[in-house]
């Protein structure tokens, strides 16, 4: 359901709970599988602070699985979620450590290519505000890894990786001649970088009309497009409520720039 994109977020969580009520779960593997799906639902809902406690509860159950491949696969899923959660908490060193643990999995038959691709793109993200060159290297490695996978899920992941790369390029003002964007929010950011503020504002208002509200990063973009400090402050507040300290650095940096200079300066957050 999740990998096919049929259900995500709260809808998936509700469906999982309903299925648990209807079925008697007999094997440890199935119990853990349901747990991992719940774990990933928290991930989809960006409940990063809850992931750590849930992973701690699940890990002993994973260790009880006797099949080595299944145990490694399930453990990898937990590590994937934790690496991203640590990144969002701005615990960059811990996030990178877990990503490298995933990359060191024994995988002679390339069964864990999607996991490795995730680890590589999270490593790239971790360098967003630190090193464009290292971020680019990891992005390209992630894309190379995804070429090993022939599935619709891999194709969607590739688009997500490229969109992440677009954000990294825009933050660092590099590689803009070869940018690929798959989300209107980053389209608006691109227009801001080019100085087309009104066009960016229109894109963001369309997103708001369609979705009913904006995401934290989208409020940041709107604040930049309109030179509205209160929107940047709202972006910061929403990021902090989510426990997302990593991306919160960006609107904080932009707020300083706008407060001092009345405009967005070149370069990313530090």
From Swiss-Prot:
Keywords: Plasmid. It comes from the Bacteria. It holds the Pfam family AimR. NCBIfam families: lysogeny_AimR. This is Uncharacterized protein pXO2-35/BXB0035/GBAA_pXO2_0035.
């Amino acid at each position: 359901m999740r990998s096919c994109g049929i259900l995500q977020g709260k809808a998936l969580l509700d469906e999982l709970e309903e299925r648990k009520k209807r079925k008697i779960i007999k094997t440890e593997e199935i119990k853990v599988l349901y747990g991992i799906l719940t774990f990933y639902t928290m991930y989809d809902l960006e409940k990063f602070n809850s992931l750590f406690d849930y992973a701690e509860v699940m890990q002993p159950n994973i260790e009880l699985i006797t099949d080595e491949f299944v145990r490694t696969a399930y453990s990898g899923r937990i590590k994937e979620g934790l690496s991203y959660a640590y990144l969002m908490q701005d615990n960059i060193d811990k996030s990178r450590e877990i990503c490298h643990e995933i990359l060191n999995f024994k995988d002679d038959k390339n069964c864990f290519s999607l996991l490795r691709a995730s680890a590589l793109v999270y490593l790239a993200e971790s360098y967003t505000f630190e090193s464009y060159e290292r971020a680019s290297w990891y992005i390209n490695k992630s894309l190379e890894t995804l070429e090993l996978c022939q599935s619709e899920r891999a194709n969607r992941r590739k688009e997500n990786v490229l969109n992440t790369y677009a954000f990294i390029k825009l933050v660092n003002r590099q590689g803009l001649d070869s940018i690929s964007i798959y989300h209107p929010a980053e389209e608006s950011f691109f227009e801001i970088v080019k100085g087309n503020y009104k066009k960016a504002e229109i894109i963001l208002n369309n997103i708001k009309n369609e979705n009913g509200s904006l995401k934290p990063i989208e409020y940041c973009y709107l604040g930049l497009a309109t030179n509205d400090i209160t929107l940047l402050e709202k972006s910061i507040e929403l990021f902090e409520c989510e426990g997302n300290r990593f991306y919160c650095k960006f609107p904080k940096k932009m707020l300083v720039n706008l407060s001092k200079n009345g405009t967005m300066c070149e370069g990313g957050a530090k």
